[in-house]
Amino acid sequence: SEMCIRDSYCEIYSDVDGVFTADPRIAPGARRIPRISYEEMLEMAACGAKILHLRCVEYARRENVPIHVRSSFSHKPGTWVCDPDFAKEHEEMPGMEEAIISGVAHDRSEAKITIAGIPDSVGRAARIFETIADAGINIDMIVQNVSQVMNGRTDITFTLPMSDSRKAIESLRRLQGELGFEDLLYDDQIGEVSIVGVGMRSHPGVTGTFFRAMASEGINLQMISTSEIRISIVVSADQVDDAVRAAHTAFGLDAEGEAVVYAGTGR
């Protein structure tokens, strides 16, 4: 995407008409979002929405520079990423969506590692994640199973970029003697699906709606992670598309007409 900085805002040109409620190639009912907050866009970018780079949104929020994402191929208005104060000062700004959820993001570039049979004692988890950090690897979700009473061992599962997985496994293998774990399990046939929206703060039923939509499609949730305005799940890779569509429909985001993608990738 190209960038053009004007006096008061930054224009970013892409091959789509702006930021959409989901990837239009997966959810045909995806709609352009007229306006979205920095914090929601940060979550969307971190969870796989490729249209804006995470660092670009972080910089814009820090400097309070509104971003206008639009298509190089049309004169249609795009998506404004800005804070509410900027929108109030500019009456021509589109209104915020009333939807509880702003969008559904997905990410197929992650893998999952399970460290099985770790002795459940103080400091083991710290040692594991220090080792991974020392290898320069960022991890995403972490789940620790309840320790087994019989043998006092536990399992820790985490997700990380697929491109870093070999380095992580090699680092952990070197520590197997010190940490005393039984096995390392690797799975790259996964995907992460996330719903993002500031409406979650005031609507308690979001988690139930999301999980019910997944259950009705027969989608098994392998891992769950939440922030104040995001819920992310890990599912098997072959269920990512179904999960995106089901979440998009469950939160009433489907539009009547289909989104236009100008023979590009939305990047």
Describe each model-derived feature in a short phrase.
Residues 14, 20-27, 31-32, 54-57, ...:
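Short acidic, glycine/serine/threonine-rich loops at helix termini
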Residues 78-267:
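A conserved regulatory-domain signal marking ACT and ACT-like small-molecule sensing domains
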Residues 1, 25-76:
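Polyanion-binding loop/helix "lid" in catalytic or ligand-binding cores
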Residues 9-14, 53-54, 68-71, 141-142, ...:
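General beta-strand structural signal in soluble alpha/beta enzymes
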Residues 3-5:
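Short, small-residue-biased leader/transition segments that mark boundaries at the very start
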Residues 12, 34, 52-53, 125, ...:
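Active-site-proximal structural scaffolding
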Residues 21-31, 36-46, 110-116, 152-153, ...:
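Short beta-alpha connecting loops at secondary-structure transitions
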Residues 15-16, 73, 145, 227:
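Residue-level "edge-of-site" marker
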